[in-house]
Design a protein with these regions (language model features):
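Active-site-proximal cap/loop segments of hydrolase catalytic domains
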Residues: 1, 7-181
Length: 181
């Protein structure tokens, strides 16, 4: 009995240098999610004996919440519980609206979905865009009612869509912090 705590240094983070960061940015953003999925697959591989694949719990906040939301939708079979905190999960719609604060500045990180290449890249990993009929893990999500950067309705839209398409009885919960943001 016990637990294992793992930190995955996936591409897009700068811990392993500038090139590692660039390998997870813009048209390479999908690498971030693929790296995380590979880590989860490795941990849950029965031959490694690290953990029961049905008991993997993952957590991330803000842009890390995007990571958690994306891998939840891409490979829901890998996780028992996912905890996206104030997650940026409707990348396509948010990045399409240049009137939202910081959007145009963030195009250098995520891409501009108003251009074909940016659209194609974001389409590949945007959690909200990619929900389909599937079995989804239990989810505990948080958002700040007054958060100007990651509005609470992004996670509410995602959870509503997952509930519409899910083929299981797992629970998706949202906690809205009314004093946060």
């Amino acid at each position: 009995a016990g637990y294992i705590y793992v930190i995955a240094h996936i591409r897009g983070g700068s811990f392993l240098g500038y090139n590692w960061y660039l390998d997870g940015k813009m048209s390479n953003k999908i690498n971030t999610f693929k790296d995380f999925i590979r880590c989860a697959e490795y941990l849950g591989d029965e031959s490694n004996k690290y953990c029961d694949p049905k008991k993997i719990v993952i957590e991330g906040r803000s842009a890390g919440g995007l990571l958690i939301g994306a891998v939840t939708v891409m490979r829901p079979d890998l996780f028992w519980i996912t905890i996206p905190g104030v997650p940026f999960v409707d990348v396509m719609n948010t990045m399409s609206d240049s009137k939202i604060p910081l959007t145009t500045e963030e195009w250098t990180q995520w891409g501009n979905p108003n251009e074909q290449e940016g659209y194609n890249n974001i389409r590949e990993y945007c959690p909200y865009t990619n929900v389909k009929e599937n079995h989804y893990p239990n989810m505990y999500c948080t958002a700040g009612l007054h958060d100007p950067r990651v509005p609470y309705w992004e996670i509410m839209k995602l959870i509503a869509k997952i509930r519409e398409y899910k083929k299981d009885n797992n629970i998706q919960m949202i906690r809205i912090e009314t004093e946060q943001g």
